[in-house]
Amino acid sequence: LAFTRSLTLHLSELPRGKVLGIVNFPTFRQAMAAAQHIVKLGPTAVELVDRIMIELALANPAFKPTIETALIGKPAAILLVEFAGADAAALQGKLRDLQALMGDLGLPGSVVPMPDEAPQKNLWEVRKAGLNIMMSLKGDGKPVSFIEDCAVPLEHLADYTDALTEV
């Protein structure tokens, strides 16, 4: 509880544009290790889609066309990297920076640029539907939301997720 006599609220203008770079990784660990470098580019969001989720989306006729637009080959994981801002040219530059970074990290040609709003929205919807897609697994075993988010320094994220996977 608090008593407030005065409050100053600083509002920011909503970004006018967004671009999405989908980074495809051959291993889950590489995706986790790359996060510490990707955040230095200043994205507004970085979200993981792992192999299980990718396979389930591909098996679902409603999601298959959308997820296919994001894939290069058969990745073990993808990161959805979103940049937002008012300057369209600057946003395109951010996508180029992401592509260059991935080349520097040994993964040239791993980024699917998605500059248009409609495909971005569709892909975010697939990501958002993740738990429902996971619940569509056949059989008695169903996924349990064990750890949603964690606070781990990014330089330790790959080791952390490796250790967690062993559990």
Model-based region annotation:
Residues L1-V167:
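Noncatalytic alpha-helical scaffold of FAD-dependent oxidoreductases
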